[in-house]
């Protein structure tokens, strides 16, 4: 890449970054937080944060990258995607009408809410316990990270339930919403994330997500400033780099350490070059249609229920890894959101996907606002926990693609909804057995005086 070519790419990158950052800033000034702000920051991180890192790798370490015209296509496709997404998100689908009382879909009380977070936490802890009994601490047993996907590791399906510890702790926080509950959320979820990091053998997702939710709650409540958020972001990048070194068993120093930091940080936070690789091989892609979305559900079907279930699922990530990169190491390389759309239907699917994503984020913001307006604090805690708990799925959306997002968000909704139903059933059983005693003002006054 020549300096002239780099200059052209830099101008396009700068314009796209300023365009998205400006719209995000105006939205932040208007509402302080919603899921459009979160997704916009996540989109910036995924598709534009990596460009400076790639540039340093090219000019400092002479690393090979896709041709400049392909990198230009990647930047422009990301910018156009966001423009279509933003217009879709801001388009009002129906006339604003005055709020009229409606019969609520469901209600929550104190006991049901506490039962819900206990069940969610129980699912996570029991899953971790069973996985640990089968495999021990994989971080200290395995020689390479790719081995966690091998037949040596049993009970892999249990990992999908680990994440429900975070929604459980979110319910606990939203019931109190003070600084102590905020700090308790951080300590408990990061401690759980470090435990799963050691047990699973290097998975950092729970730590990243817990830290991100902690920061956004702090921004919403005014407990941290934007400068503190930026400093925490830098600290998070350094922390993820250190965990990656431990995961891969790397011991580096000097120029090698700087080089390793650049490419690991790029691959962890901003795999935008993967989109460029897909565009470079565009003519060789056999478009998969909507099949990757259907196939991604296969991993949630137990083998005893479907004996002939394919052991290897050809979703967009695996198609990119196996067919485009010819990589059969056992790891799935993230194709990114736009890359998954390219695998499914080529360039035509990019604006269509942007419209779908705009509607998805719009739905989450509708739920979030519903929680903000809800007078029942127990129901509000459940709604907010669901919305913030889905942040993991939004990260999957940006990094892994639309197919992975759909299967995971459906799984999340089913498990979360099942926990709600079980909590309500248990409450009904306890109440029928006479074990539930409603609090009254007189009893509370007696307790205080005693």
UniProtKB/Swiss-Prot annotation:
Protein name from the UniProt record: Probable ECA polymerase
Gene: wzyE
Membrane topology: Multi-pass membrane protein
Cell membrane listed as a keyword: yes
One term of GO molecular function: polysaccharide binding
High-level lineage: Bacteria, Pseudomonadati, Pseudomonadota, Gammaproteobacteria, Enterobacterales
Disulfide bridge map: none
Pathway: Bacterial outer membrane biogenesis; enterobacterial common antigen biosynthesis
Intracellular or extracellular location(s): Cell inner membrane
Source organism of this protein record: Escherichia coli (strain K12)
Domain of life of the native organism: Bacteria
Subunit structure: Probably part of a complex composed of WzxE, WzyE and WzzE.
């Amino acid at each position: 890449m020549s300096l002239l070519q780099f200059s052209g790419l830099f101008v396009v990158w700068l314009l796209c970054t300023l365009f998205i950052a400006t719209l995000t800033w105006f939205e932040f000034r208007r509402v302080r937080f919603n899921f459009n702000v979160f997704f916009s920051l996540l989109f910036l991180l995924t598709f534009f944060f990596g460009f400076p890192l790639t540039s340093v790798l090219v000019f400092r370490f002479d690393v090979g990258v896709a041709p400049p015209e392909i990198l230009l296509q990647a930047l422009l496709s990301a910018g156009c995607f966001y423009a279509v997404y933003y217009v879709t998100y801001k388009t009002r689908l129906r006339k604003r009408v005055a709020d009229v009382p409606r019969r609520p879909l469901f209600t929550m009380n104190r006991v049901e809410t506490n039962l819900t977070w206990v069940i969610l936490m129980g699912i996570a802890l029991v899953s971790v316990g069973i996985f640990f009994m089968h495999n021990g601490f994989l971080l200290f047993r395995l020689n390479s990270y790719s081995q966690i996907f091998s037949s040596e590791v049993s009970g892999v399906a249990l990992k999908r339930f680990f994440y429900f510890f975070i929604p459980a702790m979110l319910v606990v926080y939203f019931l109190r919403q003070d600084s102590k509950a905020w700090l308790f959320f951080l300590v408990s979820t990061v401690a759980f994330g470090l435990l799963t990091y050691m047990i699973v053998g290097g998975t950092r997702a729970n730590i990243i997500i817990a830290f991100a939710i902690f920061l956004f709650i702090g921004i919403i409540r005014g407990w941290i400033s934007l400068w503190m958020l930026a400093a925490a972001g830098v600290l998070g990048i350094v922390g993820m780099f250190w965990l990656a070194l431990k995961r891969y068993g790397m011991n580096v120093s000097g120029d090698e350490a700087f080089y390793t930091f650049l490419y690991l940080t790029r691959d962890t936070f901003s795999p935008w070059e993967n989109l460029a690789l897909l565009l470079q091989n565009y003519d060789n892609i056999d478009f998969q249609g909507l099949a990757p979305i259907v196939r991604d559900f296969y991993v949630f079907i137990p083998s005893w229920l479907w004996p002939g279930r394919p052991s290897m699922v050809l979703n967009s990530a695996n198609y990119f890894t196996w067919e485009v990169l010819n990589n059969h190491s056992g790891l799935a390389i993230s194709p990114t959101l736009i890359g998954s759309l390219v695998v499914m239907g080529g360039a035509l699917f990019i604006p269509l996907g942007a419209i779908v994503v705009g509607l998805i984020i719009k739905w989450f913001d509708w739920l979030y606002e519903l929680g903000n307006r809800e007078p029942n604090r127990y129901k509000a805690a459940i709604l907010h926990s669901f919305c913030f708990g889905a942040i993991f799925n939004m990260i999957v959306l940006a990094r892994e693609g639309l197919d992975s997002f759909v299967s995971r968000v459906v799984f999340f909704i089913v498990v979360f909804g099942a926990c709600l139903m079980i909590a309500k059933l248990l409450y009904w059983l306890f109440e029928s057995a006479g074990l539930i005693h409603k609090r009254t003002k007189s009893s509370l006054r007696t307790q205080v005086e005693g």
